[in-house]
């Protein structure tokens, strides 16, 4: 079979690459069943798609007819890396053209149930509340509108320890930090997240207050 995701080729995307797809084995099915294995793909026009690997058809029970609109509630994001699949959870980051303005969409990482597509958790790499860790590392009146710090590189997964390892990028805009003074935790960081809860286990920031577009572009190697 051949599957065409029907992407709008005139969408004016900031990125036009796709680094692959992922798979999930359904432990509630046996090999040979149409829904034994699913192909999980994310598109540059911001959709998460689940297909039956045997037929190439959308999984009707996933999201809305096999599709989730990742832009809903977030904004003009794209996805260029394959989703991570860990312990019946799909985890997806995003990419965006983050050097055009400061108020870009947030670089949220989201986790979905592999069977239903229901949202399990979302994590914003920019602390928005005073009770969030790292909130005091973002200083400025416009910080609440600062976007990006997104995870556009592939995400690594350690199922045995229930951990995800996420590489984040610089905040928006890339080359001017006057509206986001401070260290800007969790931008430009390797972040370990508990997959089942979406809570941060630990992080290491490679660049404090990035104004050079020093995204962590590589997938963490375990």
Predicted regions and their residues:
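Extracytoplasmic/lumenal domain signature
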Residues: 1-11, 25-29, 48-74, 108-145, ...
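Repeat-blade elements of multi-bladed beta-propeller folds
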Residues: 15-47, 75-101, 108, 143-179, ...
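Short Asp/Glu-rich motifs
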Residues: 102-103, 132
């Amino acid at each position: 079979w051949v599957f065409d995701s029907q992407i709008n080729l005139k969408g004016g995307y900031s990125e036009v690459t796709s680094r692959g797809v992922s798979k999930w084995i359904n432990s509630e099915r046996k090999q040979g069943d149409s829904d034994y294995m699913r192909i999980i793909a994310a598109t540059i026009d911001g959709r998460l798609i689940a297909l039956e690997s045997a037929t190439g058809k959308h999984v009707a029970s996933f999201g809305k007819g096999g599709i989730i609109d990742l832009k809903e509630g977030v904004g003009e994001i794209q996805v260029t890396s394959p989703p991570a699949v860990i312990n019946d959870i799909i985890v997806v980051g995003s990419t965006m053209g983050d050097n055009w303005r400061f108020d870009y969409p947030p670089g949220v990482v989201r986790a979905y149930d592999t069977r239903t597509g229901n949202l399990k958790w979302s994590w914003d790499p920019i602390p928005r509340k005073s009770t969030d860790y790292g909130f005091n590392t973002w200083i400025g009146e416009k910080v609440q509108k600062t976007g990006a710090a997104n995870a556009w590189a592939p995400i690594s997964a350690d199922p045995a320890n229930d951990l995800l390892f996420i590489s984040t990028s610089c905040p928006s805009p890339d080359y001017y930090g006057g509206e986001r003074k401070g260290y800007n935790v969790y931008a430009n960081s390797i972040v370990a997240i508990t997959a089942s809860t979406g809570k941060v286990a630990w992080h290491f920031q490679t660049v404090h207050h990035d104004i050079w577009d020093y995204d962590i572009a590589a997938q963490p190697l375990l």
